[in-house]
Design a protein with these regions (language model features):
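Conserved AMP-binding A3 loop
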Residues: 1-17, 21, 29-31
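Conserved ATP-dependent adenylate/AMP-binding module captured primarily in the ANL superfamily
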Residues: 20-31, 93-102
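Active-site glycine/GP-rich loop and adjacent strand/helix microenvironment
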Residues: 64-301
Length: 301
């Protein structure tokens, strides 16, 4: 469903800053500045905004589209008109037509959206993405776990490609991948968010204890709680994370609070299921598009 989250004048620049820094970190680490010389696409929601009681309302990606830094905007695709198309299939078709002959170096979006875009290009040309966009260098993604999509993407692209994982949310930009060699994403600790955490094992207890960054430990699953300069206090976004480093603070997203099953006290979380699936496809090469997990408390057989 739709949720309305405040974005203040104080919080909006932090979304832009974190997204910008993710690209700048990549350039600083790899010394490959050519990634910003070609065309780049950000698959996002419509930038059309409604106005109610003097307040602009829209999708986060659409709002942010109005504030793209000028040095990125000059090479940004698609056009504003194409970006405003509401019907997703028509929008992707229009984006394909607009970008297929361009020198694309950077492509960004939620993996399912980008997958649809790549599939339409392959259907139209009969070629892999590396043959259509030989200068394509960097894939920026977020929103869902990329691991289940990785093999499918490598097949569509035709080669391995550098990637940057982002952890943006309407509530605040939480983390981004700052290294091609280190595991995890760098927690944004100077971006208008004060973080608190509750260990997942204690989350459903009445006496659950919140802790600050000073007390977190590596390897423990935490529910993340946000206090922001947009006006959110003690806000539970529903995600679970795990620290892989505390100097600097680096995290991985392990799932959702609601995505667990414990019919028999087993406390199975999304991270464990996805890890098992990844191990399985290494043994039996296959591609998994969708999964469903549920306990059979009273099976018929």
């Amino acid at each position: 469903g739709v949720k309305y989250i405040p974005i203040s004048k104080e919080s909006l620049p932090n979304h832009i800053k974190a997204a910008r820094d993710s690209i700048l970190n990549y350039i600083a680490e790899t010394k490959k500045s050519s990634v910003v010389n070609g065309k780049m696409i950000f698959l996002q929601g419509s930038p059309k905004l409604l106005k109610k009681e003097g307040i602009h309302i829209g999708r986060l990606s659409g709002i942010v589209a109005h504030h793209t830094p000028y040095y990125l905007k000059r090479n940004q695709l698609p056009s504003f008109q194409t970006n405003c198309i509401e019907e997703w299939e028509k929008k992707i078709d229009a984006i394909v037509e607009e970008t297929i002959s361009e020198k694309m170096t950077l492509i960004s979006g939620i993996p399912p959206w980008v997958k649809m875009y790549f599939e339409k290009i392959k259907k139209k040309t009969g070629k892999t993405i590396k043959d259509v966009f030989p200068d394509f260098e960097l894939f920026i993604y977020g929103g869902v776990n990329y691991a289940p999509y990785k093999k499918g993407f490598e097949k569509l692209i035709g080669k391995r490609i550098a990637g940057i994982e982002l952890y943006p949310a309407s509530e605040g930009f939480i983390a981004y991948q700052d290294s091609q060699t280190e595991k995890g994403m760098l927690l944004c600790v100077n971006h208008g968010i004060f973080y608190e955490f509750v260990a997942c094992d204690d989350f459903f207890n009445n006496n659950r204890k919140r802790i600050s960054l000073a007390d977190v430990k590596i390897g423990i699953n935490y529910v993340i709680i946000l206090n922001t300069n947009a006006g959110l206090w003690g806000y539970i976004i529903g995600d679970t994370i795990k620290f892989v480093s505390t100097n600097p603070y680096r995290i991985i997203v392990t799932g959702r609070v609601a995505h667990f099953t414990s019919a028999f006290g087993e406390h199975v979380i999304a991270e464990e299921i996805e890890s098992s699936l990844n191990d399985a496809v290494k043994i039996i090469p296959t591609q998994i598009n969708e999964i469903h997990v549920a306990p059979q408390v009273n099976p018929k057989k």
